[in-house]
Amino acid sequence: MQQLNPSEISEIIKQRIESLDVTAQARNEGTIVSVSDGIVRIYGLADVMYGEMIEFPGGVYGMALNLEQDSVGAVVLGSYLTLAEGMSAKCTGRILEVPVGPELLGRVVDALGNPIDGKGPINAAASDAVEKVAPGVIWRKSVDQPVQTGYKSVDAMIPVGRGQRELIIGDRQIGKTALAVDAIINQKDSGIRCVYVAIGQKQSTIANVVRKLEEAGALANTIVVAASASESAALQFLAPYAGCTMGEYFRDRGEDALIVYDDLSKQAVAYRQISLLLRRPPGREAYPGDVFYLHSRLLERASRVSEEYVEKFTNGAVKGKTGSLTALPIIETQAGDVSAFVPTNVISITDGQIFLESAMFNSGIRPAVNAGISVSRVGGAAQTKIIKKLSGGIRTALAQYRELAAFAQFASDLDEATRKQLEHGQRVTELMKQKQYAPMSIAEMSVSLYAAERGFLQDVEVAKVISFEQALIAFFKRDHADLMAKINEKGDFNDEIDAGLKAGIEKFKATQTW
């Protein structure tokens, strides 16, 4: 039997003690007390921040939303089925970030910026916080450059400018998404980057929008952020903020971007669900008290920023360029009720609204824009010169027509002036109709509006107004291509362009059929 020398034993113990790694690791850790409906209550997280990322076992993350005296209420980002009571939860010291940059263009991502289109990983060079403070008053510039939607009724009567927030509001299935998607398609050659955020939509609807953008050649210029109806309420609530951060990347570097939120009613519903599960007190229509702030802090981030802001943000790399983020939020109403809680909130936050009416849609007037109650509060300053000059009488003609049409139902004999106004109104209403996925250029719109404004439609039958317009535009494209190019390039209106349009339409009416 081998005998151990006591000095050897003490030497071995000494070596073991010296090689022991006893570096202390400070970690803020807590224990899950309850898990239900995507909400986790955690005990023991002392130094957690509001909105901080919390790490759970298995690579699942959550976000702290309720900081109470003895526990923290967090919402799980993704599936919570693997979590159970008694598991540990760690603070990360980070707030939620998403990837940003041109690498995301042409891709479909979820609310956390992960690709879901099967085209491989996105190697974005940068990431940014989902929740950011909007630029201050000093850094903003007034809106004076247009965003062409390609719709006659919108660009002529309710113009949208770069950096504006223009609400699209109406009942379900009356063309709200179609209008926004057409606005994105129209930007493919304008240099404006686009972000389309789908909140609580059916996956088939999102796939359809992506396919249409691809067919029109606009997907390469667009980021699609999708939080479909099958996603958790937390991701539907976060998706608009994530999309906004992706759009701000371009704004802050002196570029122009357009973001569509489709739709914010569903985001409010998702937020209501989270708030009620977190046991926050409900208010009107069971929405929490801060539902106004939910939308105001999102929409205030859409703005036009000054050259100084861009220069400061890029550390002098970009000089003399303003940046803009234009927002087109969509709100769905119930039976045309614009006085409900969320619609009134968003109307008061935005710089105007495009109101779509189901009665007009059902009677075949598409896009179903109600010119009477639609308004753009700042877009007038941004309108293209030629469109501004030619669209002056359009809104008046439509407003007078709707008033007189209601009156004419009861009157048997009408005087000549009233009859002329009615007939002109009918033709203008017909002219405002437009097919989906067929946005018009400034020149095409100008030809159309010039014909209406200068009385060239008076002898055209109401039923033939659309075919007249199509033939007229085709004629101008063929025989007056230089004039069309000049209008598209500058958007100016002068005596030369006036004479060119007049001569062209007169020649068309004398020589062509429609």
Curated annotation (Swiss-Prot):
Subcellular location: Cell inner membrane
Binding site for ATP: G170, D171, R172, Q173, I174, G175, K176, T177
Main subcellular localisation: membrane
Domain of life assignment: Bacteria
UniProt keyword annotations, A-Z: ATP synthesis, ATP-binding, Cell inner membrane, Cell membrane, CF(1), Hydrogen ion transport, Ion transport, Membrane, Nucleotide-binding, Translocase, Transport
Annotated catalysed reactions: ATP + H2O + 4 H(+)(in) = ADP + phosphate + 5 H(+)(out)
Any one GO CC term of the record: proton-transporting ATP synthase complex
PROSITE patterns, sorted: ATPASE_ALPHA_BETA
Keyword Transport recorded: yes
Enzyme Commission number(s): 7.1.2.2
Pfam family, one: ATP-synt_ab_C
One GO MF term attached to the UniProt entry: proton-transporting ATP synthase activity, rotational mechanism
Membrane topology reported for the UniProt record: Peripheral membrane protein
Group of enzyme by EC: translocase
Residues of the site described as Required for activity: S374
CDD domains: ATP-synt_F1_alpha_C (cd18113), ATP-synt_F1_alpha_N (cd18116), F1-ATPase_alpha_CD (cd01132)
Signal sequence residues: none
Subunit structure: F-type ATPases have 2 components, CF(1) - the catalytic core - and CF(0) - the membrane proton channel. CF(1) has five subunits: alpha(3), beta(3), gamma(1), delta(1), epsilon(1). CF(0) has three main subunits: a(1), b(2) and c(9-12). The alpha and beta chains form an alternating ring which encloses part of the gamma chain. CF(1) is attached to CF(0) by a central stalk formed by the gamma and epsilon chains, while a peripheral stalk is formed by the delta and b chains.
Free-text function comment from the UniProt entry: Produces ATP from ADP in the presence of a proton gradient across the membrane. The alpha chain is a regulatory subunit.
Family recorded in the similarity comment: Belongs to the ATPase alpha/beta chains family.
Protein name: ATP synthase subunit alpha
Native source organism of the sequence: Ectopseudomonas mendocina (strain ymp)
Gene: atpA
